[in-house]
Amino acid sequence: MSVVSLLGVRVLNNPAAFTAPYEFEITFECLEQLQKDLEWKLTYVGSATSSEYDQELDSLLVGPIPVGVNKFIFEADPPDLKRIPTSEILGVTVILLTCSYDGREFVRVGYYVNNEYDSEELNKEPPTKPIIERVRRNVLAEKPRVTRFHIKWDTDSDPTEFPPVQPDADVLEDDGETYGAEELELEAALKRELEELDSQDADKMDVGEGRDDVDDNESDAGSEDLEGETSGSDDEEEEEGFEGEDEDVEMGDDSNPTPDQHQHPNPEVMVH
């Protein structure tokens, strides 16, 4: 739960000249006493193709903040034309109003801004070099894009550090040098065990040749009951196996996936 909630933002001077400062009336609610100030920023997106043209127009520290509903006026300078490509001055762009606590952004409000001339003639046939004195901006204040982020506040416990600290990672042996060594050792051990089992089976066959007739009679005597029991148990195991598979699929248990299962990590969604 967020300690600070943004209740509303009003764009006071809108529409306005391109060179006029931005003015916002911001209303927010604070649920508990904060140890530090809130930092508000206004960023102008100078180009849709590259973030290098983004400009931080102004920032403001607000505090100490009393518990309850608070309201203040945030005024920011217009963008620096020297940092905007000439082809990007006119048209639609974006401004971002953000608020952070202790360096952690928890709310972002995006507005579309339309920059155009104040006459139809100039808009139909714009001059090669923009006439800034005739350019007006119109912030689409009725359609803001609000994004909220979960952050750590004063009373929250520290989040689990990810990835975990691994102080011995640099002194460990390079995986590239030992890649596949363990598999080769297991394969060699398995071959040795199979060879030993083959030699033991050969010895047993030599000793047990004299008991073939007796073993055949004994096996024939109990074969009927054993087959019946075996077939019944096989059916039960088969039914149980299908029930288990249905349960795994239905419950979504991926702890023991079958070889033909393909696991697709959910993309992680990202809103801008």
Swiss-Prot record:
<feature type="compositionally biased region" description="Acidic residues">
    <location>
        <begin position="212"/>
        <end position="253"/>
    </location>
</feature>
<dbReference type="GO" id="GO:0006337">
    <property type="term" value="P:nucleosome disassembly"/>
</dbReference>
<dbReference type="GO" id="GO:0000785">
    <property type="term" value="C:chromatin"/>
</dbReference>
<feature type="region of interest" description="Disordered">
    <location>
        <begin position="152"/>
        <end position="173"/>
    </location>
</feature>
<comment type="similarity">
    <text>Belongs to the ASF1 family.</text>
</comment>
<keyword id="KW-0143">Chaperone</keyword>
<keyword id="KW-0805">Transcription regulation</keyword>
<dbReference type="InterPro" id="IPR017282">
    <property type="entry name" value="Hist_deposition_Asf1"/>
</dbReference>
<comment type="subunit">
    <text>Interacts with histone H3 and histone H4.</text>
</comment>
<dbReference type="InterPro" id="IPR006818">
    <property type="entry name" value="ASF1-like"/>
</dbReference>
<dbReference type="GO" id="GO:0042393">
    <property type="term" value="F:histone binding"/>
</dbReference>
<feature type="compositionally biased region" description="Basic and acidic residues">
    <location>
        <begin position="201"/>
        <end position="211"/>
    </location>
</feature>
<feature type="region of interest" description="Disordered">
    <location>
        <begin position="195"/>
        <end position="272"/>
    </location>
</feature>
<dbReference type="GO" id="GO:0006335">
    <property type="term" value="P:DNA replication-dependent chromatin assembly"/>
</dbReference>
<dbReference type="GO" id="GO:0005634">
    <property type="term" value="C:nucleus"/>
</dbReference>
<protein>
    <recommendedName>
        <fullName>Histone chaperone ASF1</fullName>
    </recommendedName>
</protein>
<dbReference type="Pfam" id="PF04729">
    <property type="entry name" value="ASF1_hist_chap"/>
</dbReference>
<keyword id="KW-0156">Chromatin regulator</keyword>
<comment type="function">
    <text>Histone chaperone that facilitates histone deposition and histone exchange and removal during nucleosome assembly and disassembly.</text>
</comment>
<keyword id="KW-0175">Coiled coil</keyword>
<dbReference type="GO" id="GO:0006334">
    <property type="term" value="P:nucleosome assembly"/>
</dbReference>
<dbReference type="InterPro" id="IPR036747">
    <property type="entry name" value="ASF1-like_sf"/>
</dbReference>
<feature type="coiled-coil region">
    <location>
        <begin position="181"/>
        <end position="206"/>
    </location>
</feature>
<keyword id="KW-0539">Nucleus</keyword>
<feature type="compositionally biased region" description="Basic and acidic residues">
    <location>
        <begin position="261"/>
        <end position="272"/>
    </location>
</feature>
<keyword id="KW-0804">Transcription</keyword>
